[in-house]
């Protein structure tokens, strides 16, 4: 069980670092896994020998942990699990090339080391070698009665990056537990494609979803987002309006439609739609930020300030509302407050850009 907990921690760490999933989803996926074959003996021996290595790794002292492993390798001719532990430590250090080399060696020593297979797939992916990641990640999927969500997502991304879009669709269909040829499958894949900046293929898949089921919730919204992304604003508006006919209680559609109207400088229409979006969902910052921009364009700067202050109260680390608030303060002559907000916006943007 310690091995399973270790793999959960590593996958959670990877997901946090890549900002793809939450660590809790990784833990849930591990609950479905078949128990990985242990590569270490019970009690003393490897567990005891690797204890200090794991302690150093938990503290982020990866070079020291690797030095400990190298000492162990020099002192003992055979230490079961040593290659595996090298791979884990290199993985946590983000040295994915060396992690792959270590996991390959671990699998030569124990071909049924499931942890090594999964972490090798992740290492290939993080090293930018999507084609090589596919084989190990496909194998991971055979261990689960239902999809391992983390591995299925990454596998789908790898298929996309190698331009194998039908296989990506099947991976996402399994992930969401829908038929591979269904409208929902095309919708989910189109969403993932847009997120990864594959806009032309995303449009193709979204249109296919509409063809299969014109009344599928959110499909017209996604197509509208794709058109907005491509600056095809009239077409985006048409799709958002179709979505509202099917899904009039969806706050995000009003927000997206308001965004489209604001790009055409139709600020009155945009303001009305933003009010409806906020009435339906007062917890999202996007409509408040856009409301601030729209009100400022209308010359209602005092009201714009209130909307932007509300957005900042909800998300104080977002640089955009601080920047817009600084501009609004400058317009109404509150120079000192304007400079403070603009400086803070710049600092937050630098911090945001510095994140991996």
Where are the predicted features?
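Canonical tetratricopeptide repeat
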Residues: 85, 119, 153-154, 188, ...
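TPR/TPR-like (Sel1-like) alpha-helical repeat modules
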Residues: 313-315, 319-353
